């Protein structure tokens, strides 16, 4: 009888270990699964499915390229250097290897001058905005906070970057563009603001306008990016 009890206890213990191992594996897989594209982002990641902006889900990763003054391509590196990224595991550097492996990120809360496409001239300061964003983010690690998905299948995100590489101090990139007159506060449909609130961004924009920085130096000739897009549809 005693032997049967011992065998039963061992079986229960082994079963508990198996359940714990499987549960841990599932949690680790969900926590550190690499998000390859917008289709991999489940609805729980986005702001609309979350109760508090103070507890937004976020992704840590690497900016592979900057496309415009307010968007870039993002390669998710879950766990960062702690899980070997950039020293044991490398982020691909050529276009073919990156195909279908990155998310298109649109900065939330701001609107940068439109670059020229398909033979159309870009807006004034579009090149400066793109160059500034590239200087701050390109080939560097950032943290993105998905807010919603736009009509172009981009993840609209709050984005923080690390002014000093590998340190924990972070800054919101949006206000950096607005303060230099390289972007304006976005007030279109589905506008979202994070981590800097709209009221703060508006104050920063007003200061840039008074100082006639960047786009604001154009005075009455300033055409907002949203108006430029409507005119060139």
Swiss-Prot record:
Recorded hits in InterPro entries, A to Z, give:
SNase_OB-fold_sf, Staphylococal_nuclease_OB-fold
User: Topologically, how does it sit relative to the membrane?
Assistant: Single-pass membrane protein
List UniProt keywords, sorted A-Z: Calcium, Endonuclease, Hydrolase, Membrane, Metal-binding, Mitochondrion, Nuclease, Transmembrane, Transmembrane helix
Q: What is its EC number?
A: 3.1.-.-
A single GO molecular-function term is: endonuclease activity
The principal location of this protein is mitochondrion
Gene3D superfamilies in the record: 2.40.50.90
Question: Under what name is this protein listed?
Answer: Probable endonuclease lcl3
The record lists the organism as Schizosaccharomyces japonicus (strain yFS275 / FY16936) (Fission yeast)
What gene is this protein translated from? lcl3
């Amino acid at each position: 009888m005693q032997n049967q009890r011992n065998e039963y206890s061992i079986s229960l213990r082994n079963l508990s270990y198996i359940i714990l191992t499987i549960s841990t594996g599932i949690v680790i897989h969900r926590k550190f699964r690499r998000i390859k594209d917008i289709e991999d982002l489940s609805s729980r990641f986005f702001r609309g499915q979350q109760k508090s902006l103070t507890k937004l889900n976020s992704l840590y990763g690497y900016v592979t390229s900057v496309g415009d003054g307010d968007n870039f391509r993002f390669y998710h590196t879950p766990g960062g250097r702690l899980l070997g990224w950039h020293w044991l595991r490398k982020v691909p550097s050529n276009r073919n290897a990156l195909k279908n492996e990155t998310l298109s990120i649109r900065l939330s809360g701001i609107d940068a001058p439109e670059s020229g496409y398909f033979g159309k001239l870009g807006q004034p300061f579009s090149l400066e905005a793109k160059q500034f964003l590239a200087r701050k983010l390109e080939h560097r690690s950032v943290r993105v906070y998905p807010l919603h998905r736009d009509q172009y299948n981009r993840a609209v995100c709050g984005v923080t970057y690390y002014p000093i590489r590998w340190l924990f101090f972070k800054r919101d990139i949006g206000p950096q563009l607005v303060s230099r007159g390289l972007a304006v506060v976005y007030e279109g449909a589905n506008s979202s603001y994070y981590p800097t609130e709209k009221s703060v961004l508006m104050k920063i924009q007003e200061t840039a306008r008074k100082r006639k920085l960047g786009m604001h130096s154009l005075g009455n000739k300033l055409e907002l990016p949203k108006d430029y897009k409507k005119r060139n549809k």
